[in-house]
């Protein structure tokens, strides 16, 4: 006998919708719990089975917390700006807004079919002007506080996409989407000064409960380095340049210097003989992406400028080279090379026959760079010193001589905040003909994205908005002409603050009401994929800290606990993708097995954080378990089974209380697979009984309800209840019922285990000795032997010594 999910699931989804069951309660007498999913980008492909894994996890927590008497905020929304919709519009001539709306409708249908307990009244959409009004407002505040500025930046320009890409969107010199060639080109861009928050972004990782590997990824991305900035003079010139080094103690081993090909001094210092070679090399570098330039495995390339610098610590002349592995945007765009003790410098020196001088004892620098530590040699006043003392002594000397100073640098760059795209938030800025730049007045926000009948690249590198002359060109009341900013914001903008808007989504006066923000923040648990470890999470933390500084939000950090679910792979352990043809559509699973089966299966596959292959057999196993519950509790006629009675059953007492305790604990700690195992153990025990107390059945159904909510609601109704199960108080357990009153005793002959028995904990030595001697296996082993001694350790063992 099986239940009909096709009838049951729509019935309860309709009930929840009509009764607004999951509307967020804001009862001042209750604690609050905020469970957040990384909101999806509504793609044309729709939901895949990877999406519901994280969503089911937050849903289980949300449903449990409601039953535990908390106000629960569990919202959903759409990260709906983005390149695919624009690409689709350019390719087909359709409107990205209409395309996005269709995709959202499809995602909504799919998500509702899975029975998630979202509060749909709080649904948000980053492309809604009432939403992006506040994204624009945050940009204006950043600008007013000196954290948004314009700069000429060498960017990743992709002519085929007609846009500039962030470094992360470029893979091996090609665009991540579409695989088109990418070139370096200087362009006017908006930047956000995330570097101003580098130390706080680093230090405040200690305030949050996040996976250590994610914290490490952020620490490495921020990349704080302590060292010294050193000034080098250029021979026969008044020019100087600075280099940053974490090892100023190795200056005596600096035998050449390298500039980034874009360094402004190259033009001035290159000798006439080297000019042609230098120009040719610079052209070659323009075609390379940052990743190609810094690839450790590639052959080193470079060219000599003909000029020399003076090493400030020993007065030596050292040649100045240019090479693509030095990037203008990192450090000062120039490095001092110590080839004896750095692998990259060593390879470069070997390739071009440059001097290699060891300044640390150890290794054989004729064969390879020595990157270990040892006492200093060939280093004048640093000779014999160990690393830490030598660094201090070198910096002290540089500061005394006025040619260097202590310095902290970061790998983190400012955030490139503009995109040459149509389908994004307009940046609320006007550039006037007299050179002034002003913000669109706050009371005029939102600055609406204009409708475009045809979206096509402008061809100039500007966004398609540049084609909309009526929108772009403006005149102020004094007749002064201006142009609106044609760049739009990146997709990261709307997702950097969306969790705040859920708290008060209809507020037209502010991002959200201050009191409400204080009640709900920080987010209690945030679940999503590890692929957002750096960018989204770093950007959201940066905006949150800025909003904290200007008094908008009450907390330093947005997300208290972060959890990354693993990836659901195809049946052959490969990533699911359209190109591989191994994507599983949840619609098909819901149709065949039901949403509860999908939810149960995804939670039972293995630990939530593990990446696991999809398996149809596992899906069938999950459905069989739900059918097994149904058969145990419900008759063919759909009424409550006769074996469910009001009578007590001592045989199930311990199993029930153990289940309540462990399942609650496992759910709290996101160990859903082991929680489900406990539900299965209880059902196995219940099948062995002639009667099952109704109270235990109700408790079981409540524990099942966060995982399989439709089936649980149906069973709850069959149990005689007229209200939803969603707010019934969570089951409790009695610790005294869990006390073990029995214990396993090991029985030994001459110290070797021969048998094991389970006995009452209270048995004394004499009783244990008697039981041991009467045990059949012990009798066999003692036959024909004389007992010399009996050792009894109550609660543990009986050892009979015999010969």
Curated annotation (Swiss-Prot):
Keyword Kinase: no
GO molecular function: aminoacyl-tRNA deacylase activity; ATP binding; leucine-tRNA ligase activity
PROSITE patterns cross-referenced by the UniProt entry: AA_TRNA_LIGASE_I
EC number assigned by the record: 6.1.1.4
Top enzyme category: ligase
Gene Ontology biological process terms, A to Z: leucyl-tRNA aminoacylation
Residue span of motif 'KMSKS' region: 575-579
Transmembrane stretches, start-end: none
Keywords linked to the UniProt accession: Aminoacyl-tRNA synthetase, ATP-binding, Cytoplasm, Ligase, Nucleotide-binding, Protein biosynthesis
Pfam families, sorted: Anticodon_1, tRNA-synt_1, tRNA-synt_1_2, tRNA-synt_1g
Binding site for ATP: 578
Subcellular location: Cytoplasm
Motif ('HIGH' region) on chain: 40-51
Keyword Iron on entry: no
Catalyzed reaction equations: tRNA(Leu) + L-leucine + ATP = L-leucyl-tRNA(Leu) + AMP + diphosphate
Gene Ontology CC: one annotated term: cytosol
InterPro entries cross-referenced by the UniProt entry: aa-tRNA-synth_I_CS, aa-tRNA-synth_Ia, Leu-tRNA-ligase, Leu_tRNA-synth_edit, M/V/L/I-tRNA-synth_anticd-bd, Methionyl/Leucyl_tRNA_Synth, Rossmann-like_a/b/a_fold, tRNAsynth_Ia_anticodon-bd
UniProt family annotation: Belongs to the class-I aminoacyl-tRNA synthetase family.
Designated name of the protein: Leucine--tRNA ligase
Gene: leuS
